[in-house]
A protein has these predicted regions:
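An N-terminal assembly and electron-transfer interface module characteristic of large anaerobic redox
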Residues: 1-397
Length: 397
């Protein structure tokens, strides 16, 4: 069987697809981007958040391409299980696929026993492989974002990422990804630290916001690359912080036995996260604190009670970016995403007042299915251009 997975987490899915794969299952990460929004809007309403239109467009275009045997193909989509509209994508995707003239299973990846009969089977072996994929991809993303803007030989960072992706996918597929994670962390950091860099002084921008827009280049019109080409270094926090936020905010309301299991899982994940952070810092790279001190640091500055969608994690990442010296933060969200408008927009002015001594500037960038790339870049320039001007003047950035 072939399982099609939509673009969502650029770095994470490159490794996570090895966790889903088996001898009988081939996993294909959809990367088609041309015309996907228009194709998606044929089958979903434009009032829906744009990640849904992109996912539907990717799937329909892939099925129309003829590259996949529709008799032996399925589509996999994650569900958070809260009141975010993303939890309702699956019935919309099924309806769209049927309307497009195809009949393939649409599977759900969730931890709430939703979609019984069409739920991806989550096993302990899969979880261990997935943990390895998440931690390695976080490490590679953090390293790449801190080195690529300064590399002396263009393309060297991306090439090293491809080399490590290939090695790590093989380890994860075999189930040995976590066995040698300590030595792998060291080898990866050492390899990236050896890349020759310039000594330029560049502005530093943080990305926060809704999961899809923050991590998916198709969703955010390759905004990270655009910023790098304009002379900025972009910092994006790792996905493992979201995983721990999700456990902390969504999975503690079960029976005592299940809750205890999730707490153990949380401690294991954060233990690996701490080791990754120590290794990064040992080789001179920067990273947020592990989840527990990361959360503790922000509790006096933002409310940590809103847990729908990306919830309080958005504000927490803004605060941590500001406290780490980042002077500009781009807040990315789909237009009409209520959880992000409440937890994001609703906190921006308060955060800027509370952190006025840091000089951090926030700019909200909304993505809409009918919006143009030019409008997105113009909005993003409201944050970047003043920072570049100040940088040329020699002011602290």
């Amino acid at each position: 069987m072939t399982i099609l997975v939509p673009a969502m987490l650029d770095e994470t899915f490159e490794l996570l697809k090895a966790a889903f794969a088996s001898k009988d299952v081939k996993v294909v990460l959809l990367k088609n981007s041309v015309g996907v929004i228009n194709s998606g809007l044929e089958f979903v309403h434009n009032d829906l958040c744009c990640p849904c239109a992109i996912m539907v467009g990717q799937l329909v275009n892939a099925l129309r391409s003829g590259r996949y045997d529709v008799r032996d193909t399925a589509f996999l989509c994650a569900q958070a299980g809260d009141s975010c509209r993303g939890s309702n994508y699956i019935p919309l995707i099924r309806k769209a696929v049927k309307k497009a003239g195809f009949d393939i299973p649409v599977l759900s990846l969730n931890f709430f026993d939703m979609e019984q009969g069409a739920r991806f089977d989550i096993t302990p072996a899969f979880l261990l492989k997935a943990l390895a994929a998440v931690m390695y991809s976080d490490l590679l993303m953090i390293l790449k974002n801190q080195i690529r803007p300064y590399e002396l030989h263009k393309g060297q960072t991306d090439e090293l990422c491809r080399v490590w992706h290939k090695r790590l996918r093989a380890d994860i597929f075999k189930g040995t990804g976590l066995i040698c994670y300590k030595s792998n962390f060291v080898r990866i950091c050492r390899d990236f630290a050896s890349i020759e860099k310039t000594h330029e002084k560049k502005v530093r921008v943080g990305f926060v916001g809704e999961l899809y827009m923050k991590y998916c280049s198709i969703g955010n019109h390759s905004l990270l690359r655009h910023y790098e080409e304009r002379g900025a270094e972009v910092r994006v926090n790792g996905f493992s912080w979201y995983v721990l936020y999700y456990i902390d905010s969504h999975l503690y309301d079960f029976s005592p036995v299940i809750t205890a299991g999730y707490k153990i899982a949380s401690r294991i994940i954060e233990g690996v996260q701490k080791l990754m952070i120590r290794t990064l810092r040992k080789y001179g790279f920067e990273c947020f604190d592990s989840f527990t001190p990361f959360k503790r640091k922000v509790q006096s500055r933002i409310p940590c009670r809103c847990t729908t969608g990306d919830g309080w994690l958005i504000g927490a990442e803004i605060v941590n970016h500001a406290l780490s010296g980042t002077k500009g933060v781009a807040c990315l969200q789909p237009f009409g995403c209520m959880p992000n408008h409440v937890c994001g927009h609703g906190l921006y002015s308060s955060i800027q007042r509370r952190l006025s001594d840091t000089g951090v500037r926030l700019v909200s960038v909304d993505f809409d299915s009918s919006g143009s790339e030019v409008n997105i870049y113009n909005r993003a320039e409201m944050l970047l251009t003043p920072m570049i001007i100040n940088n040329k003047k020699g002011e602290k950035i």
